[in-house]
Amino acid sequence: MNDTNDRRRLGLLVALLLAVTASSYLGAQANAPITIQKQGSFAVGGKILGDAEGKSLHCDHGYVDYQIPVKPRRVNLVMWHSAAATAWLNRWDGGEGYQSIFLRRGYPVYIWDGPHVGRANWGCTENTYKPGIGRDQGNFTAWRFGAQYPNWFEGVQFPTKNEEAWNQASRARYLEFDTVVNAQMQSDAAAKLMDKIGPSVALTNSAGGMRAILTALKTNNLAGIVMYENVGYVYPEGEGPGGTVGGFGPIEVPLEEFKKLTKLPMQMVWGDNIDKAGNYSNSYKLSQLFAEKVNKYGGNAEVLKLTDVGLKGNTHIPFADMNNVAVADQLSKFLAKHGLDKR
């Protein structure tokens, strides 16, 4: 009898030690230095304008910086925002963002600025910037921090007492050019990026998603798309939601062209409170329609509500939220499910 009890105690002790060891290992991994074997940056795509005198202007290109970790996985992650690439770099409070999280997980990470925005703003056409007083308050509701400034949603995944976090978030913007023409131009450059770097999964946010969908029609090197809170879609001719085409579509293409989207897995991810601020309820319904059309023709598209997997309070930019590691875990599951995590 005593021997049985001793064995039980020993078993419990071993289990406890293994749990502590695993926890310590994971903690050490999270805080360990990130080892990079290669990093750099380059412009890609674009045009060259010229005149009769031989003068020229390089313009309408995209710009990317990248880091490749030691012993990288085979598929790159291209992080594509529509408002500011900085959203991929940090959590709202300055903690680790998706760039660092996925470098630690072994993925080559590319931070992308499409033509005309951020570090690629040398355009071939004239643009005018007009300061918009009140944009900060507009961001508050558009990013679903709350239904009305300055009233935060209860449990929102933002450090609401951190004034510097709000200051940094308010400065994480640059001009957006939300037209179908611009979306096509950006996808032209992005397709050239994919062809240069090889098989990649595009991670997008907001208007970036429609641009990545268009990119998939122009390259065979887009291995998947994960769209965080996408607001624009592409449909087969005659099967879209109808209505006037605006900056976020809807765009319709011939069925045979649309079927290219059935060759890669796609996931549309949504945060919390989508029915309480902005026009996200409609965007959510459009994501369901898009998935329905892709799957109708043999594709693999899914819609994930983070609340359905127990994640509460996420904003329009969940990969920068305070629980972004848990959000990243959902992405890791998607990548593994589709064989996109191989080394």
Model-identified regions with their sequence ranges:
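N-terminal cap/lid segment of alpha/beta-hydrolase-fold proteins
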Residues: 29-72
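Short beta-strand element of the alpha/beta-hydrolase
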Residues: 74-82
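The serine-hydrolase catalytic nucleophile loop
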Residues: 87-97, 114, 280
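Conserved alpha/beta-hydrolase
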Residues: 99-121
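Conserved acidic catalytic loop of the alpha/beta-hydrolase fold
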Residues: 180-201
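Gly/Ala-rich beta-loop-alpha elbow adjacent to hydrolase catalytic centers
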Residues: 203-212
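The feature captures the conserved acid-bearing segment of alpha/beta-hydrolase catalytic domains
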Residues: 231-298, 302-304
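Catalytic active-site module of serine/aspartate enzymes centered on a nucleophile-bearing elbow/loop
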Residues: 317-343
